[in-house]
Amino acid sequence: MAIKERIGVVVSDKMDKTVVVAVSNRVPHKKYGKIVGQTRRYKAHDEENACHVGDRVRIRESRPLSRTKRWAVTDVLVAANRP
C-alpha cells in the first residue's frame, strides 16, 4: 500500500510539535455535478517546530502519534512572509 501524501497550508501552529494543515480539494457534486471545494484539516507532527501559519507544506501518512495525529510534515514547500 502506498504512503499517502497531501499538500496544504498551515492554519495553526499553537501546539507543541504539532501543526494543523488545511488541504483543499475540488470535486464534482455527486448529484448535480457542480465543482465544489472541500477543505479537510489534518493534525500533523512537526518535530522541529519549523512550520508557521501560512506555510505551504507537504505531509505524509504515519503511524498514530496521538488520538488525532496520524500525519507528519515532510518538508516546507513555500514559507509564509514573516517580518
UniProtKB/Swiss-Prot annotation:
Q: Which InterPro entries match?
A: NA-bd_OB-fold, Ribosomal_uS17, Ribosomal_uS17_bact/chlr, Ribosomal_uS17_CS
Keyword tags: Ribonucleoprotein, Ribosomal protein, RNA-binding, rRNA-binding
The protein's matches in Gene3D superfamilies, at most eight in alphabetical order, are given as: Nucleic acid-binding proteins (2.40.50.140)
* Signal peptide positions (record): none
GO terms for molecular function, please? rRNA binding; structural constituent of ribosome
Stored SUPFAM superfamilies: Nucleic acid-binding proteins
Oligomeric and partner information? Part of the 30S ribosomal subunit.
Cited function: One of the primary rRNA binding proteins, it binds specifically to the 5'-end of 16S ribosomal RNA.
Q: What is this protein called?
A: Small ribosomal subunit protein uS17
Q: Which organism is it from?
A: Acaryochloris marina (strain MBIC 11017)
Taxonomic lineage of this organism? Bacteria, Bacillati, Cyanobacteriota, Cyanophyceae, Acaryochloridales
